[in-house]
Amino acid sequence: MARMVQCIKLNKEAEGMDFAPLPGELGKRIWNQVSKEAWAGWLKQQTMLINENRLNMADPRARQYLLKQVEKHFFEGGADTAQGYVPPPAE
């Protein structure tokens, strides 16, 4: 049976992740409060941030920036968005 969490991002009970996606306290917090579906949404946004801002993931400052963004995305009311990104129209 899948582990269920009350997802802080989707505001509903949903399937939880199988393991903490990050080390440390932030990873535990995400594992306990974020669903697989919400994490998948973050990964898409993270990819856009990396690409649009041309982040070099070998640079510790880029990694710190993304850690702050993931915390803002789930727990502080919104992370940065890719500059100039316009979501596709709803069908």
Curated annotation (Swiss-Prot):
The terms under GO molecular function for this entry are: iron ion binding
GO cellular component assignments: cytosol
Q: List the disulfide bonds.
A: none
Alphabetical UniProt keywords: Iron
What Pfam families does the annotation carry?
Iron_traffic
What processes does the entry annotate via GO biological process terms? cellular response to oxidative stress
Q: What does the sequence similarity comment in the record state about its family? A: Belongs to the Fe(2+)-trafficking protein family.
Functionally, this protein is described as follows: Could be a mediator in iron transactions between iron acquisition and iron-requiring processes, such as synthesis and/or repair of Fe-S clusters in biosynthetic enzymes.
Per its record, how is this protein called by name?
Probable Fe(2+)-trafficking protein
Q: Which organism is it from?
A: Polynucleobacter necessarius subsp. necessarius (strain STIR1)
